[in-house]
Curated annotation (Swiss-Prot):
Positions bound to Mn(2+) 2: 125
Main location: nucleus
Extent of Pro residues compositional bias: 14-27
Cofactor binding annotation: Binds 2 magnesium or manganese ions per subunit.
Organism: Homo sapiens (Human)
GO term, biological process aspect, one: signal transduction
Skewed-composition ranges (Basic residues): 1-10
GO function term, MF aspect, one: manganese ion binding
The protein's name in its UniProt record: Protein phosphatase 1M
Regions of compositional bias (Low complexity) in chain numbering: 38-48
Positions that bind Mn(2+) 1: 125-126
Length: 459
């Protein structure tokens, strides 16, 4: 992203367009639940008839509808936080064409197998309405397939070539690639990053055309060539649970965890704050009585703290306010990465949030082929509604308590996903602290690793 593009796109040269007046707009996509929930026992309507926290139904795929790797899935709608369940999910088989069709002889010689195959699981946690999450669920896998097909020649090579289509300009090109340490997995990571960016642009166009607003986080797992790639943009989370190990597979991106990046942007482009916010962080919101006093603060270049004398400009609302799950960017948004939010502005202002948001995911690679897998080794992916009330250790305890005693049950991973959600609802046998209930939408995938590569009978 060039500085020139950034200035043209986000900085005042011309006045920002006035906010759209409220009014009815057609959604760019119809509201729906994930395709693999069709035929499930709970009604697929927009909202459940009863939304009391103690009576919200948990939904899972119907018996006989098998997800990739026999993964389990469950979800629950929020407790009257919004009209719709703003979470979305998608999963299926990735079929990546290995080369373009040419003469039959060339095809038979170069491509003994037409497709490189993998699997895909994704969770999208929407905000500001369900539209962005639905668009992401409909779009991201197609973006990823296109990006992977563009680099498939490098994926199937022993070492990614410097040039595609077999060209070699410099005899030492393979050495340069080797010295850079470029591997096939780096091409998959690049494809994921580019797919997120492409999907973000699609969502922006669709929502703008329909006069809609909204965004979503995205947590995506991709299995390809014996490795599991976990791409995260937002505050959903994935962990690997084994008999003697709990391994985080994602990092949560919030205004607090990305404070320095966000402050740095405000330092370079102060116009983005429109004179209404201070980029500096203080332990609390400053008051008039703090003027002239030396107080603790930190800026974009600081991981530690120092003291400064309070000036009038320091009394403005902080760029990042609150801590933990309560931290907000420009008093508005609880995440710093995701898809969408192109039209989002601070209430009653023309101050845009999109310049501070990234659609680029962090990608973690799990080399599944190198693990000595046990039958009960699983990856748990969930939106933040689960992690708001359950820790990694509590989730792992539930996994280890349930799976060993149910190894003959073909639906055990689905039942485990349901049990994890029930544990967020404050039941008497729940692990959560007394009275601790998740009122948010909650969506969970439980992906067993022992059956990796097993074909799904229904995608």
């Amino acid at each position: 992203m060039s500085a020139g593009w950034f200035r043209r796109r986000f900085l005042p040269g011309e006045p920002l367009p006035a906010p759209r007046p409220p009014g009815p707009h057609a959604s760019p996509v119809p509201y729906r639940r994930p395709r693999f929930l069709r035929g499930s026992s709970s009604s697929p309507g927009a909202a459940d008839a009863s939304r009391r926290p103690d009576s919200r139904p948990v939904r899972s795929p119907a018996r006989g509808r098998t997800l990739p790797w026999n993964a389990g899935y469950a979800e629950i709608i929020n407790a009257e936080k919004s009209e719709f369940n703003e979470d979305q999910a998608a999963c299926g088989k990735l079929c990546i064409r290995r080369c373009e069709f040419g003469a039959e002889e060339e095809w038979l010689t170069l491509c003994p197998e037409e497709f490189l195959t993998g699997h895909y699981w994704a969770l999208f946690d929407g905000h500001g309405g369900p539209a962005a999450a639905i668009l992401a669920a409909n779009t991201l896998h197609s973006c990823l397939r296109r990006q992977l097909e563009a680099v498939v020649e490098g994926l199937v090579a022993t070492q990614p070539p410097m040039h595609l289509n077999g060209r070699c300009i410099c005899p030492s090109d393979p050495q340069f690639v080797e010295e850079k340490g470029i591997r096939a997995e780096d091409l998959v990571i690049g494809a994921l990053e580019s797919a997120f960016q492409e999907c973000d642009e699609v969502i922006g166009r669709e929502l703008e055309a329909s006069g809609q607003m909204g965004g979503c986080t995205a947590l995506v797992a991709v299995s390809l060539q014996g490795k599991l790639y976990m791409a995260n943009a937002g505050d959903s989370r994935a962990i690997l649970v084994r008999r003697d190990e709990i391994r985080p597979l994602s990092f949560e991106f919030t205004p607090e965890t990305e404070r320095q990046r966000i402050q740095q942007l405000a330092f370079v482009y102060p116009e983005l704050l429109a004179g209404e916010f201070t980029r500096l962080e203080f332990p609390r919101r400053l008051k008039g009585d703090d003027l002239g006093q030396k107080v603790l603060f930190r800026d974009h270049h600081m991981s530690g703290w120092s003291y400064k004398r309070v000036e009038k400009s320091d009394l403005k609302y902080p760029l990042i306010h609150g801590q933990g799950r309560q931290a907000r960017l420009l008093g508005t948004l609880a995440v710093s990465r995701g898809l969408g939010d192109h039209q989002l502005r601070v209430l009653d202002t023309n101050i845009q949030l999109k310049p501070f948001l990234l659609s680029v995911p962090q990608v973690t690679v799990l080399d599944v082929d190198q693990l000595e897998l046990q039958e009960d080794d699983v990856v748990v992916m969930a939106t933040d509604g689960l992690w708001d009330v359950l820790s990694n250790e509590q989730v792992a305890w539930l996994v280890r308590s349930f799976l060993p005693g149910n190894q003959e049950d073909p639906h055990r991973f689905s039942k485990l996903a349901q049990m994890l959600i029930h544990s967020t609802q404050g039941k008497e046998d729940s692990l959560t602290e007394e009275g601790q209930v998740s009122y948010d939408d909650v969506s969970v995938f439980v992906i067993p690793l022992h059956s990796q590569g097993q074909e799904s009978s229904d995608h």
